[in-house]
């Protein structure tokens, strides 16, 4: 696989750093974005995060526990505190991390020093840590000769309870009295689950970036259509395959956003053969009776009933459409999709704009309906480009036809005129009703080819109506469960037969 050492593209963009006060008070930080073969790196650039035009600038978080307002003297600590090592236990909340920034490191010939403590977060709540404290160890791990990066990693990999051994460094504390820099170690990753958001929300908020952030491009999700409230079309969202790393960027104009999205997607696409090979191997290992070929894989943006959206990883095999919240990395994860749609009972009902009221991005959307024993499941998805829409449309239609040709025949128990029967539907032989009374001979009660079928319908509960014309007219079959699966299979057989005859392009 690509090494990621070459950076084919770099440039300055803005990173969404949170929300500020006032209307439209989103805060953006200027960052340097580097696109390599297998990762996207976002690093701080010159300039502080700023609010949207017209918004009220938020004050900087106050440095507490002795780090006073700009120009103030460093904290006055008891003399005994200056002479001893201290052990402080920090209990992290679910969000916010430790709530400190650090400076120093072996490469700077300095100890690891607390340069900022954020008000209200875990470190602040101990009331026992101070700006100017040197961190000597973390949970027993010695940091006395650690580099800056080693210290950051040691702090990040801690659990809910962190034991810090510290010592106050009086001689260096004045250096931090006006400091707003340092490395924040409070970046907590979101949970690995589908990122759901409402139409008014542009996505998960990111805290101020003070160190490089790397997003792996292997099966990453990229979207320029993450929010309808983007009149200038400048927004860009990138999410790692497992949902752990998400960044939300803003380009200078629509052309720049389109260019960056295309370049990032091209790098992701270059890694697809490796992803497909890995998943194919997992699929073969989890299906000892014979594996299915993966026909298509990619991210879709699903329109949720609530009005929001969620990135959904779709994997199309010869028989099924499998939907996941993230990239499955194990056989167990691959065998447990969030949803499964058997292609033989699935129908593409529209691709592109539909009639009537349509949701955001309808021009790049498609809808699927699947017949199940509980009724009809309907899902609406959107993609990022006309090329993606065409590819998914073609693969889904072809997949439904392949599934129909592969299955050939389905059967189900039913009742006809009060008599127990079995209904068999064959793609070539048509419809056959067999007697199913206990002990009775397997007699054929009715046989009709597909060509005689004039109409089919159902009541959505248990009844299937088939009209073959002639003397029989319409027959009514009670399938004893929701008939939608059989209705959709009949449609797939018909569609496959029509396509086989070359009546559709």
Curated annotation (Swiss-Prot):
InterPro entries the record matches: PDZ, PDZ_sf, PH-like_dom_sf, PH_domain, PHsplit_syntrophin, Syntrophin, Syntrophin_4th
Composition-biased stretches (Polar residues): 195-209
UniProt KW keywords: Actin-binding, Calcium, Calmodulin-binding, Cell junction, Cell membrane, Cytoplasm, Cytoskeleton, Membrane, Phosphoprotein, Repeat
Location within or outside the cell: Cell membrane, Sarcolemma; Cell junction; Cytoplasm, Cytoskeleton
Role summary: Adapter protein that binds to and probably organizes the subcellular localization of a variety of membrane proteins. May link various receptors to the actin cytoskeleton and the extracellular matrix via dystrophin glycoprotein complex. Plays an important role in synapse formation and in the organization of UTRN and acetylcholine receptors at the neuromuscular synapse. Binds to phosphatidylinositol 4,5-bisphosphate.
Summary of subunit composition and partner proteins: Monomer and homodimer. Interacts with the dystrophin related protein DTNA; SGCG of the dystrophin glycoprotein complex; NOS1; GRB2; GA; TGFA; MAPK12 and the sodium channel proteins SCN4A and SCN5A. Interacts with the dystrophin protein DMD in a calmodulin dependent manner and with related protein UTRN; SGCA of the dystrophin glycoprotein complex; F-actin; calmodulin and with the other members of the syntrophin family SNTB1 and SNTB2. Interacts with MYOC; regulates muscle hypertrophy. Interacts with DTNB.
Protein name: Alpha-1-syntrophin
Gene: SNTA1
